[in-house]
């Protein structure tokens, strides 16, 4: 109950779903008209809650996201959320088009995967979206949430919660396509949620009673059996704003890089066995200098982007272990990667440099723009031509 309320509150606080990767999406507005070939996916899904995922077939993590989207679809259907249309739009670039079959293979026929025509207007551009973005529309085709990294990672519950909100809550007003069956289902969901409100209250009072006697029991302040020392709830503790654990850098060594300790311990507790070298790397974090190529529209050439990924989440999928960044990074960077053996391989998704970078006329050190980000101050400094 409280977990759901926390997620809903976090989603409310996120501006347009917290997606930093795109310009401000028009909340509760109809999706702009877009077609792929002679098909109109949004028109075809009218009357259902529509989930549009912008995934890149040439990206390993995107393939993993597609597989997780299929798992999420099955999970929601098992919970009774049936009237949902799932749409995946592949990137328009040639590398992604060549690997389109790999992307389509990750999902069932219940999820439509569209290949863009390179001669048509880029759908991602029309939707103000970037790689790994999720756009959730209500039954009338109005945008309820636009989630970008890191909130769109399906290892987090934000996409699932956003879909449920779009399904049962009238965030954008009434919709004539809402059926009586959907209203009855949502009423039952609301009643079931309300019936659980008394249970946490009673449990909370019970814990308060025991807290008063905590010093009498062995004089111990050890964490509970199910709690790792210094651990956080990964699913619900992700801050909804830019205030992402900056204070960790000022605490003593035992609390420094708390996200790493949490991730490693969490993985081990779930049967994910990491080697000693992997655990050391996990605590050290992934800090790589990565080269990025900005979009041609920005008029900028290749730039250098420093991604500092300090709060890692490890998850095993098949024979691979994925390493994901669970924090806000400078607007220029987005870290994600594959944790293989003793190395963290990061890829960097570049965005247009912040306005502050454009205003700084520093003598260039290279033939191309060079933007570096200070991990402590979370500020970017750019040398432009």
UniProtKB/Swiss-Prot annotation:
Query: In Gene Ontology terms, what is one molecular function of this protein?
Result: selenium binding
Q: Where in the cell is it found?
A: Secreted
* Region (Disordered), start-end ranges: 196-262, 357-385
Q: Which GO terms describe its cellular component?
A: extracellular region; extracellular space
Q: Which UniProt keywords apply?
A: Disulfide bond, Glycoprotein, Phosphoprotein, Secreted, Selenium, Selenocysteine, Signal
Domain of life of the organism encoding this protein? Eukaryota
Where in the chain is the Cysteinyl-selenocysteine (Sec-Cys) cross-link? 59-62
Disulphide connectivity of cysteines = 168-186, 172-175
Establish whether keyword Glycoprotein is in the entry. yes
The positions flagged as glycosylation sites are 83, 174, 188, 365
Q: Does the keyword Transmembrane apply?
A: no
Quote the tissue specificity entry. Answer: Widely expressed, mainly by the liver. Secreted in plasma.
Task: Output the Pfam families linked to this UniProt entry.
Answer: SelP_C, SelP_N
Q: Enumerate composition-biased segments (Polar residues).
A: 360-369
- Could you provide one GO biological process annotation from this protein's UniProt record? locomotory behavior
PTM details? Isoform Se-P1 contains several disulfide bridges and a selenide-sulfide bond between Sec-59 and Cys-62. These bonds are speculated to serve as redox-active pairs.
State any further remark: Plasma contains 4 isoforms, which are named isoforms Se-P10, Se-P6, Se-P2 and Se-P1, according to the number of selenocysteines they contain. All isoforms arise from the same mRNA. The 3 shortened isoforms terminated at the opal stop codons at positions 264, 282, 371, when selenocysteine has not been inserted.
Function of the protein = Might be responsible for some of the extracellular antioxidant defense properties of selenium or might be involved in the transport of selenium. May supply selenium to tissues such as brain and testis.
The similarity annotation says: Belongs to the selenoprotein P family.
What does the record say about domains?
A: The C-terminus is not required for endocytic uptake in the proximal tubule epithelium.
Q: What is this protein called?
A: Selenoprotein P
């Amino acid at each position: 109950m409280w977990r759901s309320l926390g997620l809903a509150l976090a989603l409310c606080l996120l501006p347009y779903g917290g997606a930093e990767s795109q310009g401000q999406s028009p909340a509760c507005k109809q999706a702009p008209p877009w077609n792929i070939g002679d098909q109109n996916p949004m028109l075809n899904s009218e009357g259902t809650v529509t989930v549009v995922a912008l995934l890149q077939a040439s990206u390993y993590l995107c393939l993993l996201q597609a597989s997780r989207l299929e798992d999420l679809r099955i999970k929601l259907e098992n919970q009774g959320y049936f009237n949902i249309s799932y749409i995946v739009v592949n990137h328009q670039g040639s590398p992604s088009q060549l690997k389109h079959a790999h992307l389509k293979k990750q999902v069932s026929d219940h999820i439509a995967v569209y290949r863009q025509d390179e001669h048509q207007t880029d759908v991602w551009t029309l939707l103000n979206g970037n790689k790994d973005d999720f756009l959730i529309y209500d039954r009338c085709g109005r945008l309820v949430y636009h989630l970008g990294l890191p909130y769109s990672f399906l290892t987090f519950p934000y996409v699932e919660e956003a879909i449920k909100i779009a399904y049962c809550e009238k965030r954008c007003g009434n919709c004539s396509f809402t059926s009586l069956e959907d209203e009855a289902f949502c009423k039952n969901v609301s009643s079931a949620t309300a019936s659980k409100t008394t249970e946490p209250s009673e449990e909370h009072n019970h814990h308060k009673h025991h807290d008063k006697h905590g010093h009498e029991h062995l004089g111990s302040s050890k964490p509970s059996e199910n709690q790792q020392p210094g651990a956080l709830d990964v699913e619900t503790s992700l801050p909804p704003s830019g205030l992402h654990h900056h204070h960790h850098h000022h605490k003593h060594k035992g609390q420094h890089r708390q996200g790493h300790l949490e991730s490693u311990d969490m993985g081990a507790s779930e049967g994910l066995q990491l080697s000693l070298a992997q655990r050391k790397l996990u605590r050290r974090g992934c800090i790589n200098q990565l080269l990025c190529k900005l979009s041609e529209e920005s008029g900028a050439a290749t730039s250098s982007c420093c991604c500092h990924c300090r709060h890692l989440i490890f998850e095993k999928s098949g024979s691979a272990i994925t390493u994901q960044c669970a924090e806000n990074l400078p607007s220029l960077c987005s870290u994600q990667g594959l944790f293989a053996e003793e190395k963290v391989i990061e890829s960097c998704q570049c965005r247009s440099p912040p306005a502050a970078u454009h205003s700084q006329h520093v003598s260039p050190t290279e033939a191309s723009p060079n933007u570096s980000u200070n991990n402590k101050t979370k500020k970017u400094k750019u040398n432009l031509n």
